[in-house]
Every structure is written in structure tokens, then in C-alpha cells.
Regions:
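Short acidic, glycine/serine/threonine-rich loops at helix termini
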Residues: 1, 95-97, 122-123, 146-150, ...
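Solvent-exposed alpha-helices and their adjacent loops that cap or buttress functional pockets
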Residues: 1, 75-78, 102, 127-130, ...
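Thiamine diphosphate
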Residues: 1, 182, 197-199, 204-255
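Peripheral docking tails and interdomain loops at the edges
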Residues: 134-222
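Anionic-ligand anchoring segments at beta-strand to alpha-helix junctions in alpha/beta enzyme folds, i.e.
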Residues: 64, 79, 83-114, 226-256
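Glycine-/acidic-rich phosphate or pyrophosphate-binding loops and their flanking alpha/beta elements
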Residues: 59-82, 213-229
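Conformationally flexible catalytic loops at phosphate/diphosphate-handling active centers
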Residues: 1-74
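Glycine-rich, anion-gripping cofactor-binding loops and their flanking helix/strand elements
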Residues: 81-83, 91, 95, 100-103, ...
Length: 256
């Protein structure tokens, strides 16, 4: 079904630009300082056009598959004041935690980044609830020596000069595949509720050296009744990871 979204004419035109001895061209030459800057900036128009193009195709994919995708997707209470901004697989854990907290009367949310570069302020603001007052940005990376991690700095820059901008703090999670659990996500939301939320924090570890970690909460399960959970132990290169991946695919393909 997705094949129809690809223009064969445009694809052929793109492939025709590949290097070929039948149509020799010179590429990669050095440019002098008198023109390099101008040439580098000339590509802005192409980057600026990407978000709208991606949004359009995401809309078409949604129509075909029924799965909704946008450059930024929001999940949670429509009038939430405290939200998390994150991207990647951790957002699934965050969404389930939001449902758990909603059952307890908590109004929180998550703004999921699907198109990171080029970063679109227009689509971010379109997805952001007007009620938001505090934001915790989660990065799965560490930039030693910087004032913050990449996504956090993007969000801070986004609100530069904006009147009544929400408070923005940042934290790190999941380095080297460290598990990110619902209890840790709850601690992030609880941090936002403080009079002075902690910035430059970590979750998932106990940092007893630089004391940047948020207080660890007792772990709890939010899986639905009837769900089977398994934990497998293996040694390096013994096939455990591959076998489990294949098993998950088989179960997924044969589960209604």
C-alpha cells in the first residue's frame, strides 16, 4: 500500500544524480573563502521545506495504515501543566505511565518528537497544549562540558524571548540501555511539581558522586491483567538476544 506514495519519476530523477562514468561530473572540490559561506547558506531553502514535506507524507501514511504520525505528537491530558518532551522507545513507557497517573487523577502529558532534524518550531508549538507551565526534557545522551544535552538546548532555544514561557529542565536516561521504568517517569513528573525543579538530573541510577539523580521510587508494574512477562538471561554471543527478537516477531505475527 505504501508503494503508491513513492513517485517513480522523482525516484528516477534522484537516482540519475548518482556518479556515473556515462555522465561524468566534478564533485567535492574545495571552495575558496570568498564563496564557501554563501554556498553553505544557499541550502537553507531545502532544509526549511523538509518539515512540511514530512508532515504531508506522514498524513498520507496515516490514511493508509491507520497509525497517526506527525512531526510532534502529544499524548496525555489536554489541560496538563506538567509534561515531558522525549523521543524514541522511552515514550511508550511514558505513555503507559501517563495512563496510570491519569487513573489517580494526575493531569500530565508527553510531547513526542518524531522529526528531530530539521527541528520545526511551528509543528512543536502546534502540538504543545496552551496549559503547559513546566517541561522536563529527557535526552538519551550525555554531552560532557555542555550546558545541557541537544534536545534540551533545542527546547530552551525555542522559548527564548517567548512571553510567559514554561519552565524547562533537562535530564538524562537510558545510557547504555539502562532500563527506564514507570517509577522513574513518575519521579520526573514529581520533580516538576517542586517549587524549584531539579535541572540536569538523571534517572535510573543512584548518583552518589555528583548527586544529580532524582530520588528513586519503589518499582511497580502497570502491565494490563493477563499480560505475560518474561526475563531471559544469557551470555555474550550465545544467541539469546537474536532468539528473543525472533520469538517476539513470531508471537506478534500470530497474535490477534
Amino acid at each position: 500500500a505504501l508503494k503508491g506514495l513513492v513517485s517513480k519519476k522523482s525516484l528516477a530523477k534522484f537516482r540519475a544524480k548518482a556518479l556515473s562514468p556515462d555522465a561524468p561530473v566534478t564533485r567535492g572540490t574545495a571552495q575558496n573563502a570568498d564563496v564557501y559561506f554563501q554556498a553553505r547558506e544557499a541550502c537553507n531553502q531545502y532544509y526549511d521545506a523538509v518539515p512540511d514535506t514530512v508532515a504531508r507524507y506522514m498524513g498520507e501514511i496515516s490514511e493508509l495504515t491507520g497509525r497517526e504520525y506527525r512531526p510532534f505528537d502529544y499524548y496525555g491530558a489536554e489541560d496538563a501543566e506538567n509534561i515531558i518532551v522525549a523521543m524514541g522507545s522511552a515514550t511508550e513507557t511514558i505513555k503507559e505511565t501517563i495512563d496510570y497517573m491519569a487513573a489517580q487523577g494526575k493531569k500530565v502529558g508527553v510531547l513526542i518528537v518524531r522529526l528531530y532534524r530539521p527541528f520545526s518550531a511551528k509543528y512543536f508549538m502546534k502540538a504543545l497544549p496552551h496549559s503547559v507551565k513546566r517541561i522536563a526534557v529527557l535526552d538519551r545522551t550525555k554531552e560532557p562540558g555542555s550546558l545541557g544535552e541537544p534536545l534540551f538546548l533545542d527546547i530552551k532555544a525555542l522559548f527564548q524571548g517567548v512571553e510567559n514561557a514554561p519552565l524547562v529542565v533537562g535530564g538524562r536516561y537510558g545510557l547504555s540501555s539502562k532500563d527506564t521504568t514507570p517509577a522513574q517517569i513518575v519521579s520526573v513528573y514529581e520533580n516538576l511539581e517542586l517549587a524549584e525543579p531539579k535541572n540536569d538530573f538523571t534517572i535510573g541510577i543512584v548518583d552518589d558522586v555528583t548527586f544529580k539523580s532524582l530520588p528513586q521510587k519503589e518499582e511497580f508494574s502497570i502491565v494490563k491483567p493477563g499480560t505475560t512477562e518474561c526475563k531471559f538471561f544469557g551470555l555474550g554471543s550465545d544467541g539469546t538476544v537474536g532468539a528473543n527478537k525472533n520469538t517476539i516477531k513470531i508471537i506478534g505475527d500470530n497474535t490477534p
